[in-house]
Every structure is written in structure tokens, then in C-alpha cells.
Amino acid sequence: MEGFWNSKSIIRITLSFIFLFICHFLDVLAAPTRNLCRPEQRDALLAFKNEFEIGKPSPDHCKIYGIESPRKTDSWGNNSDCCNWEGVTCNAKSGEVIELDLSCSSLHGRFHSNSSIRNLHFLTTLDLSFNDFKGQITSSIENLSHLTYLDLSSNHFSGQILNSIGNLSRLTYLNLFDNQFSGQAPSSICNLSHLTFLDLSYNRFFGQFPSSIGGLSHLTTLSLFSNKFSGQIPSSIGNLSNLTTLDLSNNNFSGQIPSFIGNLSQLTFLGLFSNNFVGEIPSSFGNLNQLTRLYVDDNKLSGNFPNVLLNLTGLSLLSLSNNKFTGTLPPNITSLSNLMDFDASDNAFTGTFPSFLFTIPSLTYIRLNGNQLKGTLEFGNISSPSNLYELDIGNNNFIGPIPSSISKLVKLFRLDISHLNTQGPVDFSIFSHLKSLLDLNISHLNTTTRIDLNYFLSYFKRLLLLDLSGNHVSATNKSSVSDPPSQLIQSLYLSGCGITEFPEFVRTQHELGFLDISNNKIKGQVPDWLWRLPILYYVNLSNNTLIGFQRPSKPEPSLLYLLGSNNNFIGKIPSFICGLRSLNTLDLSDNNFNGSIPRCMGHLKSTLSVLNLRQNHLSGGLPKQIFEILRSLDVGHNQLVGKLPRSLSFFSTLEVLNVESNRINDTFPFWLSSLPKLQVLVLRSNAFHGPIHEATFPELRIIDISHNRFNGTLPTEYFVKWSAMSSLGKNEDQSNEKYMGSGLYYQDSMVLMNKGVAMELVRILTIYTAVDFSGNRFEGEIPKSIGLLKELLVLSLSNNAFSGHMPSSMGNLTALESLDVSKNKLTGEIPQELGDLSFLAYMNFSHNQLAGLVPGGQQFLTQNCSAFEDNLGLFGSSLEEVCRDIHTPASHQQFETPETEEEDEDLISWIAAAIGFGPGIAFGLMFGYILVSYKPEWFMNPFDRNNRRQKRHKTTH
């Protein structure tokens, strides 16, 4: 009975609890909903949202990175729980906002130091990536001391990162990728001892990276890609034993690749490309057993193929391109059984084609173009079908036929066998099996076979890029194929193909963006339909015999580059060009255009970056208000008059200004010194006049103001502020060839006097420096400040009236290759310091009043004797050496000392007197005999007249 009662009691109690729970639950449901979000947190979030503009969503941009919900702040409102807002995470107990993810939310605006985000004190995660924030990282963020995760990537933050970022001592993740931060990376970053991820890539940091980076022992990812860090890699990086990703690519790091990188045995990714590394790859790299991707391309590495890399059997990608590697590729590279992508292009590898590469089953990309491989192109046994997607072996020294086994590479989407010396006919049907090709380069095959373009294109259904340059292409508007090609080409290269008419099939290529038909024999007019291709952005018509343009009804606005130089275009510049509203580069140089520069080109003022109209017959003045973002303006060799428009001083992007060989009549444009990027200034052969006042040209590398009427003296400190010519070598690696221009599609060119001859610079190296003041009326002394231009290569001051001594500071011009001070009034000695200038290959001191010992440097011994002529006081062994084959008396007199010269002059005077004395006596005796004997009337009458005057005078007195 007792047990029963106990069981009954338990049941009753249990039912009572259930009843009470249900009642409580119903009360809860009936009660108003409690907000987890704290009011001050909600207010801070709303205030932060209102600090910025919210733009249109950009889902495509964000989807690339897996972000599917842009404009997260659209869900934010005053009457809802902020903890339920998209992108907001709260602490479940306290209601404090601890995570804020506003990535890809279309937020625009500048961060302020008093931003409301500072009130979210307990934030541990802040993700503001993929927006349009501007300004500096302010204390509003740097004081969020609880942060462990901070992502500001892909914005427009700028300025320096303050040392106070070191206050975020709990950070484990810091991503500043793709902003505009500048200055030196603060050493305080290295105080963030818990960091596992640090990405500073795609910014503008410079200088040496802090050596204290080695203290971040937990770091697994370090990316400094695409900045301007310089110097050697900090040795402390060798202490980061947990690193799996190290990317130092696209900086200015120099020296040898340090061996301590081989200590980072956990690395799976190593990027060192696009720096200034020299020497060989360290043997310690053999320790990187976990490495799967290695980039060392675009450096100055040398030596044979680094066999130490053959130990890295896990490599899937190996990029060695654009270095100075030599020797042959080793057959045991096949030990890299996981290799998928192998790039050894643009080196100096020799030997025959390494067909053993085809035995690596995983290999899908082979790039060996731009080496010195030679012999017959043989592929050996190719598995069928091959897995190869890309084969680039062009621009080598291969000879012979195209291997028939190429037809087995059926998965190829890119093939480059350009510059293969086939030495005979080619059966182009061999390519008909490569149905997957998207990109085909068979330019310059040295074949006698003519290509029927329409027939050739019928082989392909997917082809997007075709390069047939340098081959013989048949009449493109006549074909044995009845139907036009069905595929839509995007890029077509037909340069130097002997074409005489516009390829008609282009008319139907509505996907065509790039067209190069330069260096042909195309005559007549450019068809109007060309400008109606909807996405055409590049057209190169240069070096043909075209005479004009058919006027299009309405050109498409897509064109960016129009290159039409060296044709026979006549008449005025066609006005339809003004309708190409996206035009960036216009080159119509070396034609026969006349008239003035069209004022309607003002429609292009916000897009036109390059305008080249040199070598035409243009007249009138330069338009005043048509260009805003010009980078390069070349109107040389025309008939332009008037003055330089002062509006040029507002073109802050201008780098090149060339107005040579016109009729411009103006004073020196000192006001151009306000242009922060001006690098080339050419005023040669105009009617400029007057003094040239002191001006600051911080970026100027080439100045040619020769053959004008400038006069006056040059101020002593004239060259003091020409910093690019004095410090260029400190900021740039001179062996790294970079050219002025717009990259792949256009590069600036000019003609400059160098070493006494006109030299055409088809491309202008950014490290090339020259000063040409010749052919003016300058006087006074050459400024001593000329010696500050330590990177100067060419200096010409000839044909002026400079006087006084040549400054000894010229000996500081250690890079000088050409010096011309001829035809002035210089006195004194040639500075002995010039004898130490080892690069000085050409010099001209002629037609001055120089005297004294000629310097004895080796470069002086290689000069022509004419370089010293008409300087009667020069002497020395160097002069005797270079003039020893000259035997004229004037030449010998030139070498003698002043004392010897004086003695010789006296002797010559006596000899001349003696020579004249003998004939004089003989002539006098003969003349006297005639007078006495014959008394000629013409001689005696004057004496009679005198006698009569005397008699008359006496009679009157």
C-alpha cells in the first residue's frame, strides 16, 4: 500500500509540474517579445550606417568571392532587434554586438576619426571588405581592442598605417589587401604576436620591411605581393616555421634569394616573382618537401636549371620564366610526377625540344617560348589523347616541318609555334584536328605556302585569337570556301602578311575587339563598316598605303586605340574621330594631314591619354582647352604657330610633351615645372626665345631645347632641383628595362642627338636621361650644379657662347656617355676628372679656347682628333695618340707648348720678311729704270702740277 501511494504521489507531482510549465510557456508567448539587442548598440550601428552612402549593389563583383548578399544594411531598421540584422552577431547573454560583417554592402564614403563604430567596444570580428571606404584607418578602429579578426580588403583606404595599430593585440587575422596604403609598414604590426594571417598585398608600401616580423611565430600566411618593398628579405622571416604561404612577389627586393627560406619546411606556396633577385636558387630549397607552387619568374636569376627542385615531388606548378637560366632542361624533370604547369619561357635554355615532358601524365601547361632551343621539332611518342591544354614553344630556333603528331594534342586550347623556320611548304590542314583551340599563334613560319584565311578558319569552331603575322595570306576577299567562317574571332593579328585589301570577313566579326593589319600593302580608304563593330577596342592600320577614311554614319564608342601612322592619309583629320568617345590613344603620325587640329576633339578631353600627330602638315595653333588627362602629346614636325597654350600647366598627368620642328614663337615655358609627372620636354627647332628662368622639374628625364633663340646665362643653381636625373639610380634598377608608354599597345618614341648623330628612340627607357641646350645663345659659365645630374647619359651644350672654365663637377657625371661642348668660348683646361668617366664614349671639345693637358683616361684615347680641333693650347700624350695620323702643319702646331709656339711664330715672321725682301728689291730697280729713262706722263704730270702751283704762289706774294 505504501509503495502504491508513493507511485501515485509521483505521478501527481509530475502532472503538476507539466501543468505549471505549460501555463508558464503560454504566459511567455502572450508576453511582449524581448529584444536581445542593447539600445546603445543599435544606435551605434544605425549611426555608422548613416555615415556612408549606399550605392547600387554589385552582385557580380561579389559572387566572384562567394559573397551572395550585397547591401546587408537594407535589413537594418529602428523597430527591429539589431541582433537579427544581416551581418550582425550578438553575444547571446549580454546582447553586445561582437561580430559585424558588412562585406560587399555597397558602402561609399570616408572614415572619420569619431566614427560611431568606436562605440561597439566588444567587437571581435569586423569585416568591411569589398566596399568603397576611403581615408585612413582611424583610431575608431584601432581602439577596438577586443578585435581578433579585421578585414578591410578591397577598399580605397589610403595614407600611412599608424603605429597605434599595434594596440589590437588580440588580432589573429589582418587583411589590408587591395587598398592604397602608403609609406613604410609600421613595425608595430610585428607586436601583434597572435597573428596567423597577414596580407598587405596590392598597396603602395615601400622601403624595407620590418625585421621584427620574425617575432610572429604563429604566422601561417604572409603576403606582401605588389608593393614597393626594397632591400633584402629580412632574415627573421626564416624563424616563421609555421608559414604555409609566403608571397613576396612584385616588389623591389634585391640580392640573392636567401638560403633561410629553405628552413620554412611547411611552405606549400612560395611567390618571389617580379623582384630583382640575382644568382642561383639556393640548395636549401630542396628541404621544401610540402611545396606545391613555386614562382620565381621575372627576376635576374642565372645558372643552369636548378636540379635541387627535382626533389620537390609534390610540385604542381613551377614558374621560372623571364630570368637568365642557361643550359639544357634535365630529362629527370619527369620525377616531378605531379607537375601540371611548367613555365620556363623567356630564358636562355639551349638544346633540343624536351619531348620527355610529354611523359609526365599530369602536365597540362608547357611554356618554353623565348629561349634558344634549336634543332628539328620532334614530339616523340605522345599518348593519345594527350591531357595538354597549352603548348607555348614559339620564338625559339627550331627548324623543319611541324610534327604530324601535333594532331594528337586534341585538348589544346592554346598553341604557339611562332618563328618556327619551316623552310618550305606547310600543310595547314594538320591543325584541323585541334577542334578545342581558342588561341593559335603560327606567326613567322618562313613558309612558302600561302594561307587562304577563310579556308583556314573553317577548321575551327571555337577560335578566339589568331596570329598569322609574317606569313603569306592570300587575297582575303576571294576564297574557295562558299560560306564565311562561322566562329567569332576576338583578336586577329595579320601584320606583315602582304595583304592588299581590307579582309572582308572582318565585317561579320561582331565579337572582334583587337585587329592588327599593320605593315601590309593595303591601299584605298578605310571602310566605314569597321567603326560599327560593336566591341572593337584596338585597331592598328600603321605602315600601309591608305589614303583616307570612309565617313561612318555613327561610329561605335568602344574604340580605345587607333594607330594609323605611316600611311598616305591626306586632307584634314576626319571629324568622325571626335565621335569615338572612349578613345584613349590616337596615333596618326607620319602622314599628310593638313589644316588645324580639330577643335571637336574637345569631346575626347576626358578619355584621350596619347595624341601623336607628328610628321604631318598641320597648321594653326595648339588648341587651348581640349585635353584634360593627356599623358603624351607629340605634334613635332608640323607647321604649328603661336604660343604654347598655358592650359598645358593644368594637365597633371602629362609625361611627354614634344613640339619640335614647328614655328612656335614663345618664351621658355617655366610654368610647365608645375607638372608633377613631366618626364620628356622637347622644344627643339622652333622660335622660342629669351632667358630660361630657374625652374623645378622633379621628374624630368629628357629635355631638348636645342636650335632656338634662348639667351642669357644659366643660374648657378639651375639644375639643383632636377631630382629625377640625380636620384633615379637610387630608386630604380637600371638593368630592369621599362619603357615609357601605355604598356602593350603603345610606347612613346622620339629622335634625339646622341654621340653626334640623330638617334631614333623607338621606345624610351624610363632610365634614359638627356640634356640638349645646343644651338642657342647662352653665355656665361656652365653652372656647377650640372654635376648633380649623376644619372645623366647625354649632355650637349654646343653652339652657344658659354665662356669661362668647364666646371670640375662634370666629373661627377658618372653615367655620362656623350658630352658635346663644341663651338663655345670655353677657356682653361678640360677637367682632369673627365678622364675617370668610364662610360664616356663620345666627346667633342672642338672650336673653343681650351688649353692645357688633355686628360689621360682610356675613353679619351678612342676619340677622333676632330673632337679637339681649334683649341690651340691643348697638349698631352692623349692628344698625340689620337692625332698621330694627322700630318698637316696646322695639326702639329696644335700640340706645341705656348713657348714653342711663340718661337716658331718669330721664325716664320723672319722667313716671310726675307721672302718678301728679295723680290721687292728687284721690282724697285726695274721700276726706277723705267721712270728715269722714259719719264711717262702718267707719272711726271703730278710733279708738273706741283711746280706750277709753287710758281703761282711766289708771284702773288
From Swiss-Prot:
Question: Which sites carry carbohydrate?
Answer: 78, 114, 143, 167, 191, 239, 242, 252, 263, 311, 332, 381, 441, 446, 477, 540, 543, 594, 665, 711, 812, 844, 864
The way it spans or sits in the membrane comes to: Single-pass type I membrane protein
The record, for PROSITE patterns, names:
LRR
Q: Name one GO cellular component term.
A: plasma membrane
Q: Where is the signal peptide?
A: 1-30
Extent of the LRR repeats: 120-143, 144-170, 172-192, 193-216, 217-240, 241-266, 268-287, 288-312, 313-336, 338-360, 361-384, 386-409, 412-433, 434-458, 460-483, 486-509, 510-533, 535-556, 558-580, 581-604, 605-629, 631-651, 652-674, 675-697, 698-721, 765-789, 790-813, 814-837, 839-862
Q: Which UniProt keywords apply?
A: Cell membrane, Glycoprotein, Leucine-rich repeat, Membrane, Receptor, Repeat, Signal, Transmembrane, Transmembrane helix
List, alphabetically, the Pfam families matched.
LRR_1, LRR_14, LRR_8, LRRNT_2
Which parts of the chain span the membrane according to its record? 911-931
Xref: SUPFAM superfamilies: L domain-like, RNI-like
Q: Where in the cell is it found?
A: Cell membrane
**Keyword Transmembrane appears in the UniProt entry:** yes
Where are the Extracellular topological domains? Answer: 31-910
Q: Known Gene3D superfamilies for this protein?
A: Ribonuclease Inhibitor
The residue ranges for the Cytoplasmic side of the membrane come to: 932-957
Tell me which family the UniProt entry assigns to this protein: Belongs to the RLP family.
PANTHER family hit by this protein = LEUCINE-RICH REPEAT-CONTAINING N-TERMINAL PLANT-TYPE DOMAIN-CONTAINING PROTEIN, UNNAMED PRODUCT
Name of the protein described by the UniProt record: Receptor-like protein 53
The organism is Arabidopsis thaliana
Q: What is the lineage of its organism?
A: Eukaryota, Viridiplantae, Streptophyta, Embryophyta, Tracheophyta
